[in-house]
Amino acid sequence: MTEKLQPLRGMKDLLPDDYKVHDYIINKARDVGVLYGYKQMSIPILEYTKVFNRSMGESSDVISKEIYSFLDKSNESVALRPEFTAGIIRSFISNGLQHKLPLKFFSTGPVFRYDRPQAGRQRQFHQLNYEYIGAKGAITDAETLKLAVDILKALEIEQDTILELNSLGCSESRSVYQQKLVEYLNDFKDQLSEESKIRLTKNPMRILDSKSEIDQKIIAAAPILSEYYTDESKEYFEELIKYLDILGVKYVINPRLVRGLDYYCHTAFEFTTKKLGSQSTILAGGRYDGLAKIMGNNDDVPAIGFAAGIERIALMREYNISEVKPVFVLPIGENNICYALEIVDKLRLQNISTIIDPVGKIAKRIQRVLNENAKFIIFIGDEEQANNSLKLKDLEKKEEYIVDFAKVLELLKKY
């Protein structure tokens, strides 16, 4: 018996009902982005692995454990994108867009991470991504957060999320804090998880993201970053809070929320929910003024962005999405097919969704139409063809009309 082929573990087909929801989410998010001046762009799914090594760091979980990376036929190390930001900044640099700042980009599509599949977490999943490049200051961060709120409102899930907010401060703040954090953690280094022992020497702030229960108990009493803010960092965060209050954005300050990469600074945020269990983050982002230079640009470029998981948004609520119901055209006999094709073509030229079903017994074809929850059937038999007319059946009203094409158009366009 021939093997029944299956998709790879953690990679799901998007069937029409799934895609309908995805498309709805993307369109709603895109429309809100347009109101804020964002323009859509697309980047390759495949990049050189070094694009992500530079941006995310080789000690990160994504690079060390989750990235789909391999040698291509030219012996180049390439990777399926695990996120959008690195590719967007690579595109910004390689296309020489430095003289067109500021830029607002919206992107969407699949990303890939070799992770343990579970509800809300697959190995191929889809994201909405927004990047605001070339604009600095707390007002930019506030506007970006308001954009995120408005997207979640448009998707009718904002009321089920909490905005968790923190400031990572400037590089000076983080440098002093990291030193204090290492001093504290060194007293517990024998008790840390194996991963955190490695991070202690490579990137200690990543330990604050650890999911290990042992690490969490140690972290609970660790120094807090806000205790080491410079005056500049304090002023920046206070200004952001002022703007958010003016905009009516509700938030909770989470002093443990960090980003473990050097190019992140100041604002970091996550929108979380209690509706999805352990996969609680719906949308997350932050300011990353240092990334462009790390990736080869001559200078630092201020930037802020965020990404949201489409599959997780889809799990948050059930969307009742209205669909265009096509008109079905059923030629009764083979000799009616040519006339039926002409009618179908005319209807489509009038932007009326039309499906012709010419094969099989008429009773079975009618049943197929009923299974599609259609509203109208057009029957074409010898009599209709001879009289240049059509038999239109309204399945909801259970009424039939024998009319010419112009009258059919008039009736169909009412619905």
Curated annotation (Swiss-Prot):
<dbReference type="InterPro" id="IPR004154">
    <property type="entry name" value="Anticodon-bd"/>
</dbReference>
<dbReference type="GO" id="GO:0005524">
    <property type="term" value="F:ATP binding"/>
</dbReference>
<keyword id="KW-0067">ATP-binding</keyword>
<keyword id="KW-0547">Nucleotide-binding</keyword>
<dbReference type="GO" id="GO:0005737">
    <property type="term" value="C:cytoplasm"/>
</dbReference>
<dbReference type="GO" id="GO:0006427">
    <property type="term" value="P:histidyl-tRNA aminoacylation"/>
</dbReference>
<dbReference type="InterPro" id="IPR041715">
    <property type="entry name" value="HisRS-like_core"/>
</dbReference>
<keyword id="KW-0436">Ligase</keyword>
<keyword id="KW-0030">Aminoacyl-tRNA synthetase</keyword>
<dbReference type="InterPro" id="IPR004516">
    <property type="entry name" value="HisRS/HisZ"/>
</dbReference>
<dbReference type="GO" id="GO:0004821">
    <property type="term" value="F:histidine-tRNA ligase activity"/>
</dbReference>
<dbReference type="InterPro" id="IPR015807">
    <property type="entry name" value="His-tRNA-ligase"/>
</dbReference>
<dbReference type="InterPro" id="IPR033656">
    <property type="entry name" value="HisRS_anticodon"/>
</dbReference>
<dbReference type="InterPro" id="IPR006195">
    <property type="entry name" value="aa-tRNA-synth_II"/>
</dbReference>
<dbReference type="Pfam" id="PF03129">
    <property type="entry name" value="HGTP_anticodon"/>
</dbReference>
<dbReference type="Pfam" id="PF13393">
    <property type="entry name" value="tRNA-synt_His"/>
</dbReference>
<dbReference type="InterPro" id="IPR036621">
    <property type="entry name" value="Anticodon-bd_dom_sf"/>
</dbReference>
<keyword id="KW-0963">Cytoplasm</keyword>
<dbReference type="InterPro" id="IPR045864">
    <property type="entry name" value="aa-tRNA-synth_II/BPL/LPL"/>
</dbReference>
<protein>
    <recommendedName>
        <fullName>Histidine--tRNA ligase</fullName>
        <ecNumber>6.1.1.21</ecNumber>
    </recommendedName>
</protein>
<comment type="similarity">
    <text>Belongs to the class-II aminoacyl-tRNA synthetase family.</text>
</comment>
<keyword id="KW-0648">Protein biosynthesis</keyword>
<comment type="subunit">
    <text>Homodimer.</text>
</comment>
